[in-house]
């Protein structure tokens, strides 16, 4: 539909046509296509002010979609694989003077004074070569019960303990939790223990104990217990004197690989046998 109106003045005559055409025959309304979210574009746009200034006023007034932060995307993707027991230690809201120390967040006594000489001599004593073990991959370690015996000799049974600092973080294959080592009422060290597990949720309970033992071993490192096991020179010499690296075969898959063992042990643990 087209409408026209003619207007004249003293100087000249001007014909003005006012067009009011709603959709002409050659115009087809196309459906609105929903654009896919481009996180890379939005990230560069919101981090580069120059890209904002180059926009026109019309485009600047339109609302832009809010970018998704990295924390939100990571938390949404990992929430399906990471679990927690929600067993965070209770935190006192208003601690009072003289009240028991809350070891979940306290650092009471950390680094205040050294322990007596008789205690230090026990902690820093050289470990017996017969107490050291080696894993098939060549890693030296001291059995967890040895650490507990050294702590009992140094501080006495009941004179030390492990206090949890965080909740247990559980993934499909690993458990971790932070612990604090308390000796004679003082915080000595904080470490996060970890333990891999296989076989489903029924193995979590055993893995939790392994996680606690791993944290104890790491805390004892700050006290100097079995510090030789962290010394590369000692490790090389001890392996040369007390260990052998031999070829072994898996009894079922028949795959061959090199493994470490103690010289005093004549055989390998299942499922490997000496070639």
UniProtKB/Swiss-Prot annotation:
- Compositional bias (Low complexity) spans? 63-88
Transit peptide interval: 1-23
Q: Does DNA-binding show up as a keyword for this record?
A: yes
Keyword tags: DNA damage, DNA repair, DNA-binding, Mitochondrion, Mitochondrion nucleoid, Transit peptide
Q: Where is this region: Disordered?
A: 51-93
Show the GO MF annotations: single-stranded DNA binding
Bias-annotated ranges (Polar residues) = 51-62
A single GO cellular-component term from the record reads: mitochondrial chromosome
Name the domain of life. Eukaryota
Q: What GO biological process terms does the UniProt entry carry, in alphabetical order?
A: interstrand cross-link repair; mitochondrial genome maintenance; recombinational repair
InterPro entries hit by this protein: Mgm101
Q: Does the keyword DNA damage apply?
A: yes
Q: Where in the cell is it found?
A: Mitochondrion matrix, Mitochondrion nucleoid
Give a single Pfam family match.
Answer: Mgm101p
Q: Which family does it belong to?
A: Belongs to the MGM101 family.
User: What function does this protein fulfil?
Assistant: Performs an essential function in the repair of oxidatively damaged mtDNA that is required for the maintenance of the mitochondrial genome. Binds to DNA.
Name this polypeptide is given? Mitochondrial genome maintenance protein MGM101
Provide the species name: Debaryomyces hansenii (strain ATCC 36239 / CBS 767 / BCRC 21394 / JCM 1990 / NBRC 0083 / IGC 2968) (Yeast)
